């Protein structure tokens, strides 16, 4: 059932974080979908998608996205940690995740576009996030 799957996912994510917690490392996690589970009303699942209620859209469409930094990583990369903290409330689409990874690793390539890395000071939300034809998700 859904609750057991959520508990198992939490167990796996926690295990991975513990595995890397004593190294100079980061762990990136994101979910494959959002889910409303009694967040502000007696409702569960991804229904009611045609509504314009921002709370409904937030809980059903936003996905968890997390960057965990080990204490060693945080201590040795304070500038990167500040950039991560500044990015917390920025809208982001996971198809730009490779840009974030390039940025975190300091990869210098013509494929790196800093304006597409949510943790970069040059980040610009470029893509329209569409719910349906003619309906944008803000």
Label every model-predicted segment.
Residues 1-138:
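Catalytic domains that recognize anionic headgroups
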């Amino acid at each position: 059932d859904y609750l057991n799957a959520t508990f198992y996912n939490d167990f796996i994510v926690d295990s991975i974080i513990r595995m890397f917690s004593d190294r100079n490392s980061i762990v990136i996690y994101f979910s494959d979908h959002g889910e409303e589970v009694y967040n502000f009303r007696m409702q569960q699942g991804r229904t009611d998608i045609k509504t314009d209620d921002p709370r409904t859209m937030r809980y059903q469409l936003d996905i968890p996205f997390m960057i965990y930094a080990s204490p060693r990583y945080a201590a040795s990369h304070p500038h990167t940690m500040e950039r991560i903290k500044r990015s917390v409330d920025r809208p982001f689409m996971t198809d730009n995740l490779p840009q974030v990874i390039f940025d975190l690793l300091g990869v210098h390539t013509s494929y790196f576009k800093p304006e597409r890395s949510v943790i970069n000071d040059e980040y610009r939300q470029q893509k329209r996030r569409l719910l349906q034809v003619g309906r944008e998700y803000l």
